[in-house]
From Swiss-Prot:
InterPro entries linked: CRAC_channel, Orai_sf
Carbohydrate attachment residues: N151
Spans within the Extracellular topological domain: 1-56, 132-159
Protein name per UniProt: Calcium release-activated calcium channel protein 1
Keyword terms, alphabetized: Adaptive immunity, Calcium, Calcium channel, Calcium transport, Cell membrane, Glycoprotein, Immunity, Ion channel, Ion transport, Membrane, Transmembrane, Transmembrane helix, Transport
UniProt-annotated location(s): Cell membrane
Entry's transmembrane regions: 57-77, 111-131, 160-180
UniProt KW Ion transport keyword: yes
């Protein structure tokens, strides 16, 4: 095997392990967050005597449904592709990397990763905010608390929901900024690595050419002395 082929196989194995790690992380995250969303939908107890805003109930139902659908889609991709990658990675043969579908399914793996870690996490943050509003909004004022009765514009339930929203909204913005910064840093790192690998491949090719030329130069001399 030439140095160039050996370097290409090492690159393929590195991509295989990265794809496997992404699929494992996506499957664990999607299973956890979708399970939480389903439990929140089932266990939340709506007050039949309270008149909930129609928009709040529609937003909570839609957010929960989309959250579960997104994570189940990512989980389905991980479940379908991961066993094939695991079967190849457990074979102790360098040439078996060609049998792995990780390069052909690269877009699907990245889609599952994005759905699970970016879109799914943002929907989960929105789910927490809506759940706080649905849970705390029916709470009435405490007639025994004079401090609360003096402020007739807001109830304790509304105050709790507003507090959770005011905490979660800045955190969501920080999460978006961090996700964009992380993605740009990752793309920059991949670009640098690709340039480095191209330089290494060029050096390997030059070294292989030098060895071939040296072998061609030695062969006529050996034939002449023979």
């Amino acid at each position: 095997m030439s140095l160039n082929e050996h370097s290409m196989q090492a690159l393929s194995w590195r991509k295989l392990y990265l794809s496997r790690a992404k699929l494992k992380a996506s499957s664990r995250t999607s299973a956890l967050l979708s399970g939480f969303a389903m439990v929140a939908m089932v266990e939340v107890q709506l007050d039949a005597e309270h008149d909930y805003p129609r928009g709040l109930l529609i937003a909570f139902s839609a957010c929960t449904t989309v959250l579960v659908a997104v994570h189940l889609f990512a989980l389905m991709i991980s479940t379908c592709i991961l066993p094939n990658i695991e079967a190849v990675s457990n074979v102790h043969n360098l040439n078996s990397v060609k049998e792995s579908p990780h390069e052909r399914m690269h877009r699907h793996i990245e889609l599952a990763w994005a759905f699970s870690t970016v879109i799914g996490t943002l929907l989960f943050l929105a789910e927490v905010v809506l759940l706080c509003w649905v849970k705390f909004l029916p709470l009435k004022k405490n007639p025994l608390d004079p401090a609360e009765n003096s402020n007739s514009s807001i109830t304790s339930g509304q105050a709790a929901a507003i507090a959770s929203t005011s905490i979660m909204v800045p955190f969501g913005l920080i999460f978006i900024v961090f996700a964009v910064h992380f993605y740009r840093s990752l793309v920059s790192h991949k670009t640098d690595r690709q340039f480095q690998e191209l330089n290494e491949l060029a050096e390997f090719a030059w070294l292989q050419d030098q060895l071939d030329h040296r072998g061609d130069a030695i062969s006529p001399a050996v034939t002449h002395f023979a």
